[in-house]
Structures are given as structure tokens and as C-alpha cells.
Amino acid sequence: IPAKELENTLQSIQRAIEVGADIVEVDIQRTRDGVLVLSHDENLKRTFRVDINIRERSWEELKKLSKDGYSPARLEEALELVGGRVGMFLEIKHPEDGGAVLELVESMGARDWVALISFYPEVIGALRGRVITGLVYAKPPGSIPEAKKLGCSLVLPKYTLATQKAVDFAHRLKLFVVAWTVNEPEKARELFERGVDGVATDDVEGVRKALR
């Protein structure tokens, strides 16, 4: 819920659950010493106002950072916090991190309520048959059949690509459709009328209200 809390923090996850999100999405990066942390960007300048590249620093260095009561969080902490109360989408930002993310998910018994998603087909292909996966994309064409070939359970198109034709095609291939990022309640309503199975939003409360 970045509209109310800083994205990719434990506070934002807790708030998302409290306001009724069915699934929480977080982004995964890895530190120099191999710790999986939550962050959309490799650099923390946008979120924590410090010019620090996560992949060049250790977790010991990162965990000391703080901004307005927020601190960087490890994926392990996020999985513990959610604990299966809702589903989780873990977006893998670097192709080489897929195996480490799955290993942690499995070690924490979270595989039943977690899906690993990525823009990178090679990540999804390597995870095939081991966990629920989804292909994220912002450019057509070909992504829906590619997701099917990769063994995905879902596709995550940029919302402008979630046309009626695309949604129907994905459903014919037995793929769920989750469109991103939809912060206008009326646009969310339109997408659900089109048949999408879910939308990623920064405003869970507003979207839920529009769908009542």
C-alpha cells in the first residue's frame, strides 16, 4: 500500500492485509552477502534517500538504514509476517536470484501460498514445476503463449494490455490474469468487467470500495 506506507516494507505488508488485500506483492533484491531483501530498485535513493546499491552492500550495512520509521526488510521477515494469511507474489528482479528465492520459500513451508513472478522468461523456465509461477510483461505480442509454454499459472500484463481479447485468450489457455498497476477505482471496475482475475494496486481500499 505505497499510497499510505512506504513500499516493500513490513508496515506496508501489514497494512495491505488489514485493509483486505487478497495477495501482497513484493520485489526481491539480493545483498552482496546473499541476503534476500525487499526492494523494487537496486538503489535505495528513491525509497530511503541514500545512494546505496543493494547488491554492493552487506545486510549488516543495510539494516542500519532508517527513514520515517521504516527500515529495509528481509524476505524471510516478510514471509514470517504473512504466514499464509494471504497469498504473496514475489517478483524476482534479477535472473540469478530465482533459485535462492525458491529455496527460502520452501525452507519456510510457504510454497502453497506464494507465487514467483518475473519479467524474465529464463527465471520462470528454471522454476517450472517447482512452484506457482507468473510471467510479468509490458509489451505484446506473444507473452501469453510464452507463459503457457513456460508452465505458468498466471500472466501479469500492464493494465493497458489487458484487453478483452487478451483476457479471453489467456483464460482459454487456463491462465489467470492479474493486471498492474491499477490505482483508479473505475479502471479496476472496467478490468474486472472484462474478466481479469485480479489487479495490482497501491490503493486496495479504493479499489475494493469501487467493486462493492
Sequence positions of predicted segments:
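Phosphate-group recognition and catalysis centered on beta-loop-alpha active-site segments
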Residues: 1-212
